Amino acid sequence: MDNLTKVREYLKSYSRLDQAVGEIDEIEAQRAEKSNYELFQEDGVEEHTRPSYFQAADDSDTESEPEIEDNQGLYVPDPEAEQVEGFIQGPLDDYADDDVDVVFTSDWKQPELESDEHGKTLRLTLPEGLSGEQKSQWLSTIKAVVQSAKHWNLAECTFEASGEGVIIKKRQITPDVYKVTPVMNTHPSQSEAVSDVWSLSKTSMTFQPKKASLQPLTVSLDELFSSRGEFISVGGNGRMSHKEAILLGLRYKKLYNQARVKYSL
């Protein structure tokens, strides 16, 4: 207490007391504006490196915004979506499916057979929507069917639809031009001795009936074909025997099935 009393008495007689108080107030005002960290530095406290989590927080604050902008175009999977084993989810398609118009053929017509003073005409309507290559294939198919009529009677053929197309069959096909093997007899007949069977076009061949009540069937190539060209066009050839040519004519005229029932062909 004595010391404190002495200090008070001394301050009363201190001539620069007001100046000292003002300096103290100014120092206190400056200290109030500074952070505790800065005060520690002024007081000589040793500066330590800032903890790593402060640095990480600062880095994340400065880099988070550009990183979000850079990843805006990337696909972010939904964390709440149900995960399926083996399934890797990727970005969804960013385009919409194009609308495709489907048009069903409505103007197609059944084949029509027309007759006039010039003859007969069969009209086949081309299917709609075919490409150039498909149209060519369709026309080639029709042409092949027409050409095949030279080697068999289409009216006697069977028509079968399959998964790959159409199958046309006939049990007994007329002899092929390049595969005919003449039957050689011990005593060759006149028809086998000639070089061209059409030279016997006016010669008749007789087939005996299976029943006594019927008359024998006598027929010639001239009666079955109008010309040698017609005979060749349906599969005939000069190397055929006379009987083979006659049987070909009966098939061509659609008389073969009826004749083989009544006569020994």
From Swiss-Prot:
Any one GO CC term of the record: host cell cytoplasm
Region Interaction with the L polymerase, residue ranges: 49-105
The record's account of how the chain is modified after translation: Phosphorylated in the N-terminus by host CK2. Phosphorylation of the phosphoprotein is required for the transcriptional function of the P-L complex.
Residues modified to Phosphoserine: 60, 64, 226-227, 233
Region span, Disordered: 42-74
Assembly information from the UniProt record: Homodimer. Interacts with the L polymerase; the association of P and L forms the polymerase complex and positions P optimally for encapsidation of newly synthesized genomes with the nucleoprotein. Interacts (via N-terminus) with N(0). Interacts (via C-terminus) with N in ribonucleocapsid (via C-terminus); this interaction allows to package the L polymerase in the virion and positions the polymerase on the template, since P acts as a bridge between N and L.
Annotated protein name in UniProt: Phosphoprotein
Originating organism: Vesicular stomatitis Indiana virus (strain Glasgow) (VSIV)
Top-level taxonomy: Viruses, Riboviria, Orthornavirae, Negarnaviricota, Haploviricotina
Gene name in the database record: P
